[in-house]
Each structure stands twice: as structure tokens, then as C-alpha cells.
Amino acid sequence: MTGRIAIVTGGTTGIGLATARALIDRGHRVAVGARGAATPAVVAEVRKHLGAEVVVDRLDVADRASCDGFVARVTATLGTPTILVNAAGIYREAFLGDHSEEDWTDQIEINLSGAFRMTRAVYPAMVAAGWGRIANIASTAGTKGAPGYAGYCASKAGLIGLSKVTAVEGAAYGISCIAISPTWVETPMMTNAFHRIAARRKISLAEARAEIEHSNPQGRIVQPEEVAALIDFFCSERAPGFTNADVQINAGADW
């Protein structure tokens, strides 16, 4: 397959960074965006992992102008993007009685509305090209209730719904869309969660990690490269019928 132009949001760490690496290895030209991507230190670190040719630019998916401007700059620099991976995401932990409206809004704006803004920004070019692939990083939390994560669960449930609508509407134009719903993944976000769990329950980080590892049948934590491998397959010519799906990478856990 001829290399295509890909955008990966949240592409400086975790699942986004691993996905960018997989797409580059497949021959695609990749632009990664994140809120902290404008600093020279972040650009240098990302290029150490992905190579000097990758485009690294600031992107705030909570801001429509930032999304539109990012896509315009990528188009001018690399060409028309026909692959979009919405990996930008945050979480805020609080039980309903203590969940602030600000934290709720932040999660919806970044995890759900951010994916909508980026999809809307690239969609016309994908329609014109007659080909497009959009992968949205959701979560098993989008289909299961996780106590203390109301905003996160709601945003990921919405993202699964957005993915299905995008798949149905885009099918006539050669555009496929899936949601990918991992369980716990070895990322900086997960590390932060371990610290919060350990502090709340007054246990060590090692104990917090062990509890999560043993909460699924495989007894381990999913690696970001596993998610990236699925996205790589989805974006290939080997999977034309792979769309309108919520694919769980859950290490066997039914939650």
C-alpha cells in the first residue's frame, strides 16, 4: 500500500506514540499533535522515538480553531490526511457527589468533543479522496460502570457512539471508523492512576499494580504496542470491511 498521511492526536506519549511508530514503520507519513508538543524538549523527545521526518505540533483538541489549524498545517506540509487516530484523552477521578462540573466538562471536551472536532476537520478531505480510516481510542470503561469515573465513562461511551455514526455515514465514501476499547494500558496516564489508587488505599505502588494485573484472567497489563498493532491492521488494505465496531483489548477481563 502506498504510504498515506496520518494524524495522531495525543501522539507524544502512550498509545498515541506507539501508534505513530507503527504507522511510520508501515510507510505512512505521520503528524502527531498534543497540547505540550510545542516545546523544543518534547519535539526532540518525540523525534528520538519516531525519527526526524515526523511532524510534531501543538494541538488542543478542546479548541476548534486549534483543530482546524492543525489539520490545515499538516495538509500544507505533508498532504491530505486520510488516517486519523484520536488518542488524546484525560481522566479525572471523583465519586458523583464530589465530581465537579469543571472536571466533567474537561473530560467530555477532550475525550469526546475533541474526537468530533478532529473528525469534522478531516472528513471533507477523506470524502474527496474516497478513502479514510478513523480510529478512536475509547475504553472498556465506556461500556462498564467504573465507580469514581463518571466523566471518563460517559466520555468514552459517547466516543463509541460517535464511532458508530461515523462508520455508518462514512461507508458510502470509503471511510471506515472503529472504536478501540482497551482495559488498563501501560501508559503515563495509568501510572498516575496507580499513584492515586495507592494514596487513596494507603498501599504501595507495587501492590496497586499487582491488584490491577490480577484483575484480569491473563494477569498482566496491556502494552500500547498491542493497541497500535490493531490500528496498523485497521489502516491497511487488508481490512476493508473492518468498520462500525467497538474492539476490546481487555486481557480477558469482562469489565
Regions found by a protein language model. Give the residues of each.
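Alpha-helical segment proximal to the catalytic Tyr-Lys
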Residues: 124, 168-169, 240
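C-terminal substrate-recognition "lid" of short-chain dehydrogenase/reductases
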Residues: 116-117, 131, 218-249
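Conserved glycine-rich cofactor-binding loop
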Residues: 5, 12-13
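Residue(s) in the substrate-gating loop at a strand-loop-helix junction
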Residues: 139
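Active-site helix of classical SDR
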Residues: 119, 155, 163
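Substrate-binding pocket helix/loop in short-chain dehydrogenase/reductase
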Residues: 95-96, 100-108, 134, 212
